[in-house]
Regions:
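Conserved donor-binding loops in enzymes that form glycosidic bonds
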Residues: 42-43, 171, 222
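N-terminal "arm"/small-domain region of PLP-dependent enzymes with the aminotransferase-like
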Residues: 1-62
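PLP-dependent aminotransferase-like
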Residues: 21-22, 103-208
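Short clusters of hydrophobic/aromatic residues that line enzyme substrate/ligand-binding pockets
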Residues: 40, 200, 213-216
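Active-site PLP attachment segment
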Residues: 216-222
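Phosphate-binding glycine-rich loop
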Residues: 66-116, 129-134, 140
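Conserved donor sugar-nucleotide recognition element shared by glycan-biosynthetic enzymes
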Residues: 64-68, 90-94, 123-124, 148, ...
Length: 222
């Protein structure tokens, strides 16, 4: 099949066939009919992503490489932030974000075992898991209904001399009260970690400026 081709020509043909394959067998949308199952979550991808997957595989590059660097650069531009690190999941992102705050380079603001971190009582376990994994103590605050985000009126009751950070998720795409939480963190000199994995693309207006969620705290995961 590839006898008369250069490696680049063979690669281009494979990628073109991959695109056609995806469009024919993966991306055909069937009209909904009564009784069809509606999944609450599923894989979301298109032909471009499948082509990139195969393109990377042809080099047998199975870890971070040129696509990773390109994505980190473009994603940082989209968010309007200086740094972006790509990982395999939101759970890993939360773990990495929290680990960064345990660095001795932070001196008196370093999160140590036994320090307290305020979070919600009804939320994602992957928001709380890093706190426990690094030996810190989660301090749970109730949520407000129907947003299922933190009730900022309860924050002052949760703070102590051991509190070092607040780690919260924007639940189901609904931003929590960033203004109130950010003011609270600034007042008490606390880190604010935004778990933005459920809300990428959501915006919040703070101090008259509309900003993407995940970019207002000290660290954000998306």
């Amino acid at each position: 099949m590839f006898e008369e081709m250069t490696e680049q020509q063979a690669r281009e043909q494979i990628l073109e066939m991959t695109k056609e394959y995806c469009e024919k067998y993966h991306n055909q949308k069937k009209p909904y009919k009564k009784g069809d199952r509606i999944p609450y979550a599923s894989r979301v991808y298109d032909a471009d992503e499948m082509v990139n997957l195969v393109d990377s595989s042809l080099e047998f590059w199975l870890t971070s490489g040129r696509f990773t660097k390109e994505f980190e650069s473009e994603f940082a531009k989209y968010l309007g932030v200086k740094y972006c690190s790509l990982v395999n999941s939101g759970s890993s992102a939360n773990l990495l974000a929290f680990m960064a705050l345990t660095s001795p380079l932070l001196k008196e603001r370093q999160i140590l075992p036994g320090d307290e971190v305020i979070t919600v009582a009804a939320g994602f376990p992957t928001t709380v898991a890093p706190v426990i994994q690094y030996g810190a103590v989660p301090v749970f605050v109730d949520v407000a209904i129907p947003q299922y985000n933190i009730d900022p009126n309860l924050l002052e009751q949760a703070v102590s001399e051991k509190t070092k950070a607040v780690m919260l998720a924007h639940t189901l795409g609904n931003p929590f009260d960033l203004k109130a939480v950010k003011d609270f963190c600034d007042r008490h000199n606390l880190w604010l970690i935004e778990d933005n994995c459920d809300a990428l693309g959501s915006r919040y207006t703070i101090d008259g400026e509309s900003r993407l969620t995940g970019t207002i705290g000290d660290i954000g995961t998306s």
